Design a protein with these regions (language model features):
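A gly/proline- and charged-residue-enriched helix-loop-helix capping module
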Residues: 148-159
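N-terminal secretory/targeting leader peptides
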Residues: 2-4, 12-15, 26-38, 48-147, ...
């Protein structure tokens, strides 16, 4: 992956964040000139002024432990928000799923609950609530590599995806993108290739795209909540599942499913969303500081993800995990052809824009 300087990355992310902020405040999110101007003039003064504003505590939900890529990303966001607001906005990060599964949290905040203010979710999690653009980020083999994803996340197209919930009348808005590495399957029994997946019971989260992908591999999609996955693997309810490498290790899945096949079927794209109720608690100065922190966090995540993933993979290999490389992904892509076609045909032009952003 081509390395991007943090300064350049923040500049690009700032444009995306500014475009989002303009749209959230009623301005046009389509004006490049307006977005650039906002990025260059909004943050510094407003963020400094935020220190004298009324104190607000916002609860941030994270389903994974703090030592994962997404957990560290949440911690960084907390630090930056509190730094840029002089402590007038405090982020209370609740990790390891203590507030419930991703779906539990979304159901709560979209149902009007005010006990959770910000949630880190899978980038496609809002698909179940009508956000069809986000679904495209979960299509198998869309992103060739990390640089491909970050080309999208720092483009003028990204705010269009992040703003979709607002356009649909949902009481949340996206504030930044991130990723936790490519997702790979892991199994209880050894596998050597795609042929070994036939008949396996693979855990899914009841997402239509994931269901179709698993069926395309000849396996049986089996719905199990993330919190119950460890015991489901241990007791034979499922034969395998899929996660990014860091989450696989941090959640102790190698203890019960020690075979990791590096198929990289999708990139684990994530986003953070803030509720309208929480956003409206903030002054304009605090909102500007939160968006500056969001842009910085997006850059932090890009710096962290690949390095952290490679470190974890080395640790897994050293500890005896059976790591299986997949040098030829063509059979996997062919197996997913149907689910790709079925889930992109209604947004073919937009999906092609994503594909064309490859590095």
């Amino acid at each position: 992956m081509k390395k991007i300087s943090r300064r350049s990355f923040l500049a690009a992310a700032g444009v995306s964040a500014a475009a989002l902020a303009l749209t959230a405040c009623g301005g046009s999110g389509n004006s490049t000139a307006a977005s650039s101007a906002a990025a260059s003039t909004a943050p510094a003064g407003d963020a400094a002024a935020a220190a004298s504003d009324p104190k607000v505590t916002l609860v941030y939900a994270e389903v994974n432990p703090l030592d994962t890529i997404v957990g560290q990303t949440g911690s960084h966001f907390k630090e930056k928000v509190e730094e840029l607001t002089g402590g007038s906005v405090v982020i209370d990060v609740q990790a390891s799923g203590v507030l419930g599964s991703e779906n539990d949290v979304l159901d709560a905040i979209l149902g009007g609950s005010t006990s959770i203010d910000i949630s880190r979710i899978s980038a496609f999690a809002l698909t179940s609530y009508g956000c069809n653009k986000s679904k495209l980020l979960s299509i198998p083999f869309t992103f060739e590599n990390r640089a491909h994803f970050w080309n999208f996340a720092n483009s003028e197209l990204a705010p269009e995806f992040l703003n979709e919930p607002q356009e649909l009348g949902l009481p949340v808005r996206g504030i930044f993108y991130g990723e936790e590495g490519f997702r790979h399957f892991f199994t209880v029994k050894p596998v050597s290739g795609i042929a070994d997946f036939k008949g396996l019971k693979l855990r899914v989260s009841n997402d239509p795209v994931m269901n179709g992908m698993v069926e395309g591999l000849g396996a049986n999609p089996t719905v199990v909540s993330f919190g119950e996955l460890y015991s489901a693997l241990q007791t034979g309810v499922v034969d395998g599942a899929e996660q990014p490498i860091a989450n696989y290790k941090s959640n102790a899945f190698p203890e019960v499913a020690n075979n990791l096949i590096l198929d990289g079927h999708t990139l684990g794209a994530v986003q953070a969303v803030i509720t309208d109720n929480a956003w409206n608690k903030l002054t304009e100065n605090q909102q500007a500081a939160v968006m500056e922190a969001a842009a910085d966090t997006q850059a932090f995540n890009a710096d962290l993800s690949e390095t952290a993933e490679n470190k974890v993979l080395d640790e897994l290999k050293s500890s005896g995990c059976n790591v299986i490389d997949v040098p030829d992904k063509a059979p996997w892509q062919e197996a997913c052809a149907k689910v790709i076609s079925e889930n992109t045909s209604d947004q073919a032009e937009l999906y092609q824009q994503l594909l064309d952003m490859k590095a």
